[in-house]
Structures are given as structure tokens and as C-alpha cells.
């Protein structure tokens, strides 16, 4: 309900800028490009504000510590996995950028696997927008799926790429 309310507010603001015809008000179908662009811009802006205020760091840090302790992961791969739940595959590795050159093959495999397993926040918004009329509780289902996919992706990555070296960030908070 919270995410759908945010998206509805974004669309009502955007319709006042570009006009109601783009949104299908008055009988036409809404333009897919308009739906996608508004979702991408809105969620990018929302995550930028949350990152600037430190909310993202707190939430991602707590999740990363929990994953590192329960799954025996290094700080870099658990931080990237936790960030992948909220941001995309291109943004999450930027949080661990200084550690990338020294990461083991297993850690890099885990970062890539979790990136493919989770849904980026902007894409999350697009999916909710497209599916909210067909499946009213879609936001909760997608969020639960993304949260469950991070540890599942890590487990699969460790089976495919077992850790043979000692990671530099093992036991460290990033």
C-alpha cells in the first residue's frame, strides 16, 4: 500500500506536468514510456534522498551484518548483496568499489549472482505500476521476493564458486 501510494502520487504530479492524455485519462490507454519514465525518475530521486539522509546506509549496513554473521560472508559481498535488494546491479558494486580489485573469484561471483537474482528499485517501481491493477498486493510480493533472493543468490553462488582463498574483508563491516 505504501509503495502504490508513492507511485500514485508521482503519477498525479507528472500528469499535471505533461497532461492527462499521456496517462489515459479520457478513455485512451496510458503510454508505456510515460509509466516507465515516471517510475524510474521517481525511484531514482527517492533513493538519492534516502542515501543522502543516511537511511540507505543504516538499512543496508544492518542487513549486511546479519548476512555476514549468519552466512559466513565477507563484508564486501554481504554489503553488495544487501544493497542489491534496493538498488540495481550497476549501483550496488559501487558501494564496494575500493575492494573490487582485491576480491576473490568467489566474492565476485557472489556479487554478480545476487545482482541478477534481485530486482532493482527502479524496475520494482515499473513492475508495481504495470501490475497493481491486475494484482493489488504486488508491491509486497515483489519486495519479499527480492529480500529472499539475496541470500538465495549468495547460497547458489557459493555452491558454484566455493571460497578457496581468505577474503580481505572477512569479518569486517564495510
Annotated model-derived regions:
Residues 69-131:
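Alpha-helical membrane segments and immediately flanking helix-loop junctions
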Residues 127-141, 168-171:
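Membrane-interfacial helix-loop-helix connectors in multipass membrane proteins
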Residues 46, 50, 124-128, 152, ...:
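Alpha-helical membrane-inserting segments
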Residues 147-174:
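Long, contiguous bundles of hydrophobic transmembrane helices that form the permeation core
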Residues 57-58, 63, 99, 132-133, ...:
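Membrane-interfacial segments
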Residues 1-84:
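Membrane-embedded alpha-helical segments and adjacent helix-loop junctions characteristic
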Residues 38-44, 137-156:
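Alpha-helical transmembrane segments
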Amino acid at each position: 500500500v505504501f509503495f502504490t501510494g508513492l507511485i500514485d502520487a508521482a503519477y498525479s504530479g507528472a500528469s499535471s506536468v505533461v497532461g492527462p492524455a499521456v496517462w489515459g485519462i479520457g478513455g485512451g490507454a496510458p503510454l508505456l514510456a510515460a509509466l516507465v519514465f515516471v517510475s524510474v525518475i521517481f525511484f531514482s530521486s527517492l533513493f538519492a534522498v534516502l542515501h543522502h539522509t543516511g537511511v540507505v546506509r543504516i538499512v543496508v549496513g544492518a542487513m549486511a551484518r546479519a548476512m555476514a554473521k549468519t552466512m559466513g560472508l565477507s563484508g564486501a559481498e554481504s554489503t553488495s548483496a544487501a544493497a542489491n535488494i534496493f538498488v540495481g546491479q550497476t549501483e550496488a558494486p559501487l558501494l564496494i568499489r575500493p575492494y573490487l580489485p582485491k576480491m576473490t573469484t568467489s566474492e565476485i561471483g557472489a556479487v554478480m549472482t545476487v545482482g541478477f537474482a534481485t530486482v532493482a528499485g527502479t524496475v520494482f517501481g515499473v513492475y508495481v505500476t504495470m501490475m497493481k491493477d491486475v494484482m493489488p498486493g504486488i508491491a509486497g510480493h515483489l519486495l519479499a521476493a527480492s529480500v529472499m533472493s539475496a541470500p538465495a543468490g549468495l547460497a547458489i553462488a557459493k555452491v558454484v564458486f566455493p571460497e578457496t582463498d581468505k577474503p580481505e574483508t572477512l569479518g569486517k563491516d564495510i
